Amino acid sequence: MAFQSKLTSIYKACDSIEGLEESLTTLLYDDNNFKAYEIIYLVMPGEANSICLNDYLYSLEEIAELFDGRMKGKIIHFANTKILDLEEEEAQYFLDITGARAISGYGVTATANSYVLDKIFFELCQKEEYVTDVVEALFEKQYALCQLLDFRLYY
């Protein structure tokens, strides 16, 4: 997907919170292009407001604290391997703590693969300046798929 969309991609498997933290640190301090990345794409299982690493659930609040201000201006996007279902206060907490511009994902897990919609979403993020314009264009292009996967964006 990254190659087809001309996106910079870094693949790193993480099986523990320490592994995720190590990968984040490497990304932040060893990758000279980090500031240019608009989207941090996370493909990991989990439940509505948590991710699962090595059979342990970590809340998005814990993940926000791990990212602590280091995602300034980025969009954190979750594939549909986990549900993203946040209350307004939870979303705002995540955004405030991480510094992210938005958090996005799906209300439906892997009944259908989100690859096609993810690809279009990433391309639109490169073209559009405002996340509201991205979402509007995404729904115009793929309304049925957005509905099927229950696409969500909190900003």
Positions of predicted regions on the chain:
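A domain-level signal for caspase-like cysteine endopeptidase catalytic cores
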Residues: 1-37, 72-79, 91, 95-98
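A short, glycine/acidic-enriched catalytic loop
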Residues: 45-75
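Well-ordered, non-membrane alpha-helical segments in soluble/globular domains
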Residues: 1, 21-26, 54-65, 86-91
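Active-site-proximal C-terminal subdomain of hydrolase catalytic domains
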Residues: 84-155
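Short acidic, S/G/P-rich loop/turn micro-motifs used as interaction or catalytic elements
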Residues: 17-19, 46-50, 82-86, 109-111
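Short His-Asn-centered micro-motif
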Residues: 42-43, 54, 76-82, 106
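Alpha-helix boundary/capping residues
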Residues: 27, 70, 138-142
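Short loop/turn segments at strand-loop or loop-helix junctions that form parts
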Residues: 38-46
